[in-house]
Amino acid sequence: IIYDHSPQKRLGVYYYESGAYPRKSSVIYDRANSSFCSLSLDELPEDIYAKTKIFHISSITLALDPSLKETAIKMIHKFHEAGAYISFDVNYRASLWSEEEAKKTVEAIFPYVDFLFVSEETSRRMLQRTGTLEEIMKGYADTYGCTLIATTRREAVSPTHHNFNSKIYMNGNFYEEEPYNNIEVIDRIGSGDAYLAGVLYGLIKFG
């Protein structure tokens, strides 16, 4: 935990508005002048890199602030050089940056990524990948050397009912769970992070 004692800084927040069919839910990010956006490498203890097994980061971090993006990319390089696994979630948010800028930035990071989390929609739209889902996932491994690629597919039947399933590609094999159809959504905030945390927990515990 890093504490920011500056009286000018604050916690970043965002505002979530639930959807009502046919209108989708929406989010407004309010991260300007937050402590997180002013993070610098000097604030991190130097021994943190060698002590870390998995360093996880999301593309939202890269989109919030130019200075933070530069710091985050340097952190990826330093953790990678120290031998940590790099876990990266390509959760693209159109309200934070353009598809062109996001694509250019994340593709430059992919060669350092061991565990890649990317939805089928993001692969096809922002990253402009074509082919079957299996071909797209295998392509990340073949092109960038990613060890694990996990992708999710979410279909919104309505704002309160979704279909969901996921697929993982690792060591030349695909793993897929039975889909969850028409599940009732109580609150989906953080559901993607929970899925990701489960995958990383499984990797740490079972390899």
Task: Identify the role of each PLM range.
Residues 1-59:
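Conserved N-terminal subdomain of the carbohydrate kinase-like
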Residues 82, 96-172:
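Conserved phosphate/ATP/ADP-binding segment of small-molecule kinases
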